[in-house]
Amino acid sequence: MLKYKNVVFDFGNVIATFDEDYILGKFCDSPEDLELLRSAVFYNWAQLDEGTADYDTSIQHAKTLVPERLHDNVTDFFRNWHKYLQPIEEIWSLIRKLKENGASVYILSNAPTHFADHADFYEIVQEFDGIVFSAPIVMAKPKPEIYHHLFDTYHLKPEDSFFIDDKPENIAAGQALGMDGYI
């Protein structure tokens, strides 16, 4: 019998690797262009995750930060980056095993609305009993409100839930509310 009824997963760097260099490399050819793109597309990523920045406005602003020859690269990045997170197969296997053993599984992840709209690109998403992405609800980890939103929306008890995230501050926030976790 499982100790926890619910296992909550972050997406980036838990379910799939979010490797900036790998992803950016899909949208440009030179190290110099990669660095130009990085500074342009990630300048307000935290606000995109929080849902406090408009995605299309961010694209337009990012274009002002790079030479004109990279404008199409910026647009292409913002429209397609979600396709280049690399699945972490061990975690996908764990998710399926947990489901087979009767656990409920959830996603709690900071992510732009664009990713929330395209997360089903990853077939593993179909396995989840519930999903909370930050931007659509204008909340983000590690603020307690997003954890409460998860608990309330899916009627979860924190003490019956276990959280897997790649950031210590997110685990600590869950623990402060009674949900055990692992980095």
Regions found by a protein language model. Give the residues of each.
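Conserved Lys-Pro-Asp/Glu-containing loop-to-beta segment of HAD-superfamily phosphomonoesterases
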Residues: 6, 140-168
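Substrate-recognition/cap helix-loop segment adjacent to the acidic, metal-dependent catalytic center
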Residues: 89-136
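Alpha-helical substrate-recognition element adjacent to the catalytic core
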Residues: 25-28, 32-65
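Metal-dependent phosphoesterase signature
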Residues: 48-92
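Generic structural signal for small/hydrophobic residues in well-ordered secondary structure
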Residues: 10-13, 51, 98, 107, ...
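Surface-exposed amphipathic alpha-helices with a cationic face
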Residues: 92-100, 151, 171, 175
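Short, acidic loop-to-helix structural element flanking the phosphoryl-transfer center
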Residues: 6, 75-106, 144
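Active-site neighborhood of HAD-like aspartate-dependent phosphohydrolases
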Residues: 1-40, 69, 176
